[in-house]
């Protein structure tokens, strides 16, 4: 991304208001919408300006190689114990892509309950550290892997979700400036994903958005829900996008697609796509 500052005042103020409230702050949203930038850049800058010492800000990025070992729940727990002990004042813990903290899958076929337990052990870690008076927890996670329903259940009412969306036009225009009509046309065409600012050509922007779409709707969803009919998922999404703004329902989709999928299966596919 270019060295331009993108303001996300609405979300930043929500983090500021929630500071030190005893809740786990969960910053969620679709991939690449600016969750990490909000937490590790804008909010961190705010804390430093408020006088928080750098050593009192613990930063973990579980999608990066340098922190890969912390994807193991036991390793993450031990690291947090060590990095928060013996410090004066509040310790602010930032964990990027928290859903990557999970035990590796074994060789035998696991039940849905076993899969959920293996993938959600990080909740126990966060719940324990949330209760420590000198620790303030902030985590990020993608919608396709970290559902609001999971958060509400696992944190027992002590988790606060901040849903981050791509840039609004006002945020977009504040960053790009120039002729407002031209900016509006570009925004309508390509949307408000922050990383588009680093791309100079239309071809690069199209390729980026196509790749992002495939990652979100196919790799993430197919992986999380272990779908075996991703071909039909693609067809359902094609129909939905071509009929944007029109009313539809599972019966109409089934009739239009002419597939062997029934209404119940199409309804399930609609549910998982809306989760993103």
What do these predicted regions represent?
Residues 5, 163-276:
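Interdomain hinge/linker elements that couple catalytic modules in large macromolecular machines
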Residues 99-138:
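Conserved Walker B catalytic segment
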Residues 94, 136-142, 163:
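Structural recognition of the conserved hydrophobic beta-strand(s) that form the central parallel beta-sheet
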């Amino acid at each position: 991304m270019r060295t331009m500052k993108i303001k996300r005042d609405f979300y930043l103020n929500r983090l500021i208001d929630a500071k030190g409230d005893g809740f786990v702050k969960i910053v969620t949203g679709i991939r690449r919408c600016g969750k990490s930038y909000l937490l590790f850049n804008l909010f961190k800058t705010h804390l430093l300006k408020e006088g928080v010492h750098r050593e009192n800000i613990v930063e973990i990025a579980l999608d990066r190689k340098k922190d890969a070992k912390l994807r193991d729940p036991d390793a993450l727990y031990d690291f947090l114990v060590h990095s928060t002990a013996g410090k004066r004042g509040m310790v602010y813990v930032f964990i990027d892509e928290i859903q990557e903290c999970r035990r590796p899958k074994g060789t035998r076929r696991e039940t849905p309950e076993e899969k959920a337990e293996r993938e959600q052990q990080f909740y126990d870690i966060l719940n324990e550290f949330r209760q420590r008076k000198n620790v303030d927890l902030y985590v990020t996670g993608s919608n396709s892997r970290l559902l609001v329903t999971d958060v509400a259940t696992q944190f027992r009412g002590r988790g606060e979700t901040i849903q981050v969306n791509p840039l609004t036009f006002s945020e977009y225009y504040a960053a790009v400036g120039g002729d407002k009509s031209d900016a509006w046309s570009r925004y309508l065409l390509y949307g408000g994903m922050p990383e588009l600012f680093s791309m100079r050509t239309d071809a690069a922007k199209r390729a980026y958005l196509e790749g992002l779409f495939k990652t979100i709707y196919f790799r993430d969803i197919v992986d999380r829900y272990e779908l075996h009919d991703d071909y039909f998922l693609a067809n359902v999404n094609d129909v939905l996008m071509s009929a944007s703004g029109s009313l539809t329902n599972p019966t109409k989709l089934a009739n239009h697609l002419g597939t062997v999928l029934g209404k119940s299966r199409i309804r399930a596919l609609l549910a998982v796509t809306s989760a993103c």
